[in-house]
Design a protein with these regions (language model features):
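Feature captures the FAD/FMN-dependent oxidoreductase FAD-binding
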Residues: 135-136, 140-144, 196-244, 341-354, ...
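FAD-site-proximal beta/loop scaffold in flavoenzymes
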Residues: 248-279, 363-437
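N-terminal Rossmann-like FAD-binding beta1-loop-alpha1 element of flavoenzymes
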Residues: 140-165, 291-299
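A conserved FAD-binding loop/helix module that cradles the flavin
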Residues: 433-458
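Rossmann-like dinucleotide-binding cores of NAD(P)H-dependent redox enzymes
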Residues: 163-166, 170-201, 206-207, 295-341, ...
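Single conserved hydrophobic/aromatic residue that forms the stacking wall/gate
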Residues: 467-482
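Ferredoxin-type iron-sulfur electron-transfer modules in oxidoreductases and energy-metabolism complexes
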Residues: 17-36, 57-89, 106-135, 262-263
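Glycine-rich dinucleotide-binding loop and its adjacent helix/turn
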Residues: 119-135, 192-211, 239-301, 408-418, ...
Length: 482
């Protein structure tokens, strides 16, 4: 056995997958999973666990896989993660658990994400469920939002015995997992829906089409409906734009809208009537995972697609795997390039985009080298569609209808990073609603921390638990074009 290199994972051929929405990565089979698990040396001081935001016992579950004990491996994972089939597919393992793997010092790290995915898929196919709480607690908790933060918080609280209800604004649960990430990366019915069923099997109730701030408010939930604590995991769904001329033209979309139409509303399926712009020449502005998702979706809808990003490939925020897949599929990367103006025809439709070439100067506040325009380097791209993928911010609806809930200048909820506690008693928050747009696993970590904080809150004397906002710590997402 080659212990230095990963067991290769099967994928659809690039030319084939570029024409369909089936999952790109086909995952390990049993033999491949056992072989890959056998590369793990089972470190006692496991750095990989330190790199996992939800602290999965990685050597523990891999040891079970090595022995072919897949159900036991699932039990180990489900102690820490409510969404293992999701995480195994979309987490940036290369910068987290796998980035800490000792095997990576001499050779390639263990394929932790692919092994997690294998175990979760095996459990689903064999109808293995997480174990519900043995004892119930007489406390009601409301969770706002059914994305990764909300599902994780709800699942952990249910395991502790709490009576948990999730309130979801959309008609379908899943948050960014269903509207933001394409089918070819994260299958909805085969994976996401089953993960949500597992959370519900713990006793969690989910109410859809409930918009907090309109249908009801946090104060009403607590004062009139008997919820003793609330977790806000409502995400960050308001898109950002550049503010350049022509941005209001027909044919300009946010990546958020474009992906929602395709992913949640199934515009890519002929049997659905959801309208979506199927451009012939498309530019996606931005360099993060969302930009890659939008570009690869537009490609599958029949377009020639350009990624326009103002820094170099080294600074691309997207996962290396996503960039690699995009290149394999034929996405054109216009790097060190920045839009100046969207060109509009006499009927108000996009006809092109004026761009300027950039070079990297001194590092800015983010630590990355600041892009600087090269004078006289302007050029035009002929286009009919522009998709802006510049990051998102939280919707202010919840904060504006909740007295005593502080937000910062970006409209992110002010919350303690250690336990999710906000400035309003009994209210906790985490995920993108606090940090701005970040990753699925970081949102899950925040949901897990908040569940622990809520448990501590409901288990103690609650005479004085209000937190001064000056003691809170906030981290901010680095958006695509910063």
């Amino acid at each position: 056995m080659d212990v230095l290199n990963k067991v290769p994972v099967r994928e659809q051929e690039p030319k084939v997958r570029a024409t369909n929405f089936d999952e790109v990565c086909l995952g390990y089979n049993k033999d491949e999973a056992v072989e890959e698990a056998s590369r793990c040396i089972g470190c006692k001081n496991a750095k990989c666990i330190e790199g996992c935001p939800v602290s999965i016992n990685i050597p523990g579950f891999i040891a079970e896989v090595k022995e072919g004990k897949f159900e036991e491996a699932y039990k180990v994972i489900s102690e820490s993660s409510a969404l293992p089939a999701v995480c195994g597919r979309v987490c940036p393992q290369e910068s987290q658990c796998e980035g800490r793997c000792i095997r990576g010092i001499k050779g390639e790290p263990i394929s932790i994400g692919k092994l997690e995915r294998f175990v979760a898929d095996w459990a689903r196919e064999n109808n293995v469920k997480p174990e519900p709480a043995k004892e119930k607690k007489n406390h009601k908790v409301a969770v706002i939002g059914s994305g990764p933060a909300g599902l994780t918080c709800a699942g952990d609280l249910a395991k502790m015995g709490y009576d948990v209800t999730i309130f979801e604004a959309l008609h379908e649960a899943g948050g960014v997992l269903i509207y933001g990430i394409p089918e070819f990366r994260l299958p909805k019915s085969a994976v996401v829906a089953k993960e949500i069923e597992n959370v519900k099997s713990l006793g969690v109730k989910i109410e859809t089409n409930v918009v907090i701030g309109k249908s009801t408010t946090i104060d009403e939930l607590m004062d009139e409906e008997g919820f003793e604590a609330v977790f806000i995991g409502s995400g960050a769904g308001l898109p950002k734009f550049m503010g350049i001329p022509g941005e209001q033209a027909n044919g300009v979309f946010s990546a958020n809208e474009f992906l929602t139409r395709n992913n949640l509303m199934k515009a890519f399926k002929d049997e659905y009537d959801t309208p979506i712009m199927k451009g012939k020449k498309v530019a996606v502005v931005g360099g993060g995972n969302v930009a890659m998702d939008a570009a690869r979706t537009a490609l599958r809808l029949g377009a020639e697609v350009h990624i326009v990003y103002r820094r170099s490939e080294e600074e691309l925020p997207a996962r290396v795997e996503e960039v690699h897949h995009a290149k394999e599929e034929g996405i054109i990367f216009d790097l060190l390039t920045n839009p100046k103006e969207i060109l509009v025809d006499e009927n108000g439709w996009v006809k092109g985009m004026t761009c300027v070439k950039m070079e990297l100067g001194e590092p800015d506040a983010s630590g990355r080298r600041r892009p600087v325009e090269i004078k006289g380097s302007e050029f035009d791209l002929e286009l009919d569609t522009v998709i802006m993928s510049l990051g998102t911010s939280p919707n202010p609806l919840i904060s504006s209808t909740t007295e005593g809930l502080d937000v910062n200048k970006w409209q992110c909820i002010v919350a303690d990073e250690n336990n999710g506690k906000t400035t309003k008693e009994g209210v906790y928050a985490g995920g993108d609603a606090v940090t701005g747009a970040a990753t699925v696993i970081l949102a899950m970590g925040a949901g897990k921390a908040a569940a622990k904080g809520i448990d501590e809150y409901l288990s103690q004397d609650r005479k004085s638990t209000r937190l001064n906002s000056s003691h809170l710590y906030i981290s901010y997402a680095v958006f695509c074009l910063k």
